[in-house]
Amino acid sequence: MTFSRTLLLVSLAGLVGLAAGCGPRSDASRTDGAAGRIKLGFLVKQAEEPWFQYEWKGADRAAAQYGFELLKMGVPDGEKTLAAIDSLAANGAAGFVICTPDVRLGPAIVAKAKAAGMKVIAVDDRLVGADGRFLEEVPYLGMSATKIGQLSGATLATEMKRRGWAAADTAACIVTFEELDTARERTDGIIAALKAAGFPADRIYKAPQKTTDIPGSFDAANALLAQKTGVKHWLVAGMNDTATLGAVRATEGNGFKAPDVIGVGINGTDCLDELRKPAPTGFFGSIYASAPTEGFRTAEMLYLWVKEGKMPPLDTRVDGQLITRETFEQVLKAEGIL
Ligand code: FCA
């Protein structure tokens, strides 16, 4: 819009405001203050997970800095996702960041967004097409999944060595969710690092979780623990904190004491209550990646894309670092999470 047209509209709006001055505030004057304010959505699959709440916090920070309106929505399933996109369109949103509940919704999400002229950025879980390949044209920001997985596996191996456990008495329970690429890359990374550290491949067991919550990982690990008798010590890991927490709970239920379990999570946001427990549990630590940074950066990228036509990079990765009971407070304070 040209400057003079904007000026004209502003003065017209002023006249309407004046005309309505004596009566109740008109709709025109109510929206006037927000006129020109860009609206952006931020849709996440598991709003109950602290990871996503911290992502939203980061996105809120971007909204405050750049002065756009952020519409945050939880989208636990496909139906709610498509309905949320419709509602964004009806609200005049210019685009949205999404961590979809199912990556195969990719083509439907993109088609709906295109039809409404909205821009899309995928965060955490990369959209895939009908052929199972990534929708590479949709800008994506997520974890360096393989690297972060490797760090988790290397942490397990180092701590096992420090505790002096014999490989013959030890086994690894890796909770998997292989239908999701970022999850599979992480757990493959864990397994690769364990093997690289000399841990016997035939003592590494996968426990596939049906749902990506604590009950899902608890059930998966429980089924495995029931089958594998004669193990004295367990190494436990998975694609995120929730996966590891459920498996640690399963070791407890099967009679393993905290000193005989080393659990390492990923995210570093969903294990804070666990790390704060007065007595150590089998949950040793987590590979922390910055959810607020991911939320901030994706929201910022989307805003600059809408506002200035600045196309975001198509693939951006975020690294992680180990946090433990000893270090988490210091690291997370520096991150502004605590
Ligand atoms: C996936 C997981 C989340 C988080 C995110 C980065 O979406 O479900 O817990 O690890 O990747």
Question: Where do the language-model regions lie?
Answer:
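Extracytoplasmic "Venus flytrap"
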Residues: 37-62, 66, 71-87, 91, ...
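Short, low-complexity disordered leader/linker segments with a strong preference
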Residues: 1-39, 111-118
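Short, solvent-exposed amphipathic alpha-helices that sit
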Residues: 51-66, 148-152, 181-200, 216, ...
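Venus flytrap/periplasmic-binding-protein-like
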Residues: 121-131, 237-284, 322-323
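Periplasmic-binding protein-like
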Residues: 41-43, 92-101, 119-123, 173-174, ...
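Hinge/cleft segment of the Venus flytrap/periplasmic-binding protein
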Residues: 22-23, 36, 174-177, 182, ...
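Structural motif
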Residues: 70-94, 207-228, 244-246, 271
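Hydrophobic alpha-helical segments within soluble ligand-binding/sensing domains
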Residues: 81, 140-169, 217-218, 267-272, ...
